[in-house]
Amino acid sequence: MTILFPFDSWQGKETATPHEANVMVILQYGAMRMLLTGDMEAPAERELIAKQVDLNADVLKVGHHGSRTSTTEQFLRAVTPQVAVIQVGARNRYRHPTPSVLDRLARFAIPYYRTDTNGTIVVESD
């Protein structure tokens, strides 16, 4: 497991939203890589891309439950996932995932699974 974000400690710092203090990790087992984004939003995605962090992953846990503020086209180009997982509650008040994120995944031909419609999702590796 490698922690990719944050780059610096958030201790003693103020954030506009709690999502700015999000932790993002990559799990690698053999050749399989899984990117866990937590509630990461577009500004952090852009920062990771600008710093040329290797984001390539086979499995992407979609950021911020599929909110419109995450999973940008630029981020999807950097990650190039084979499949995406969206952790979201059924009939949630925010109506996540948003149609814009689902459309982006479709445009990139990335199949996805949602916990609200698919239930528990298990990712297996060699």
Q: Which sequence ranges carry the predicted segments?
A:
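Non-globular, low-confidence helical/coil segments that flank catalytic cores
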Residues: 1-126
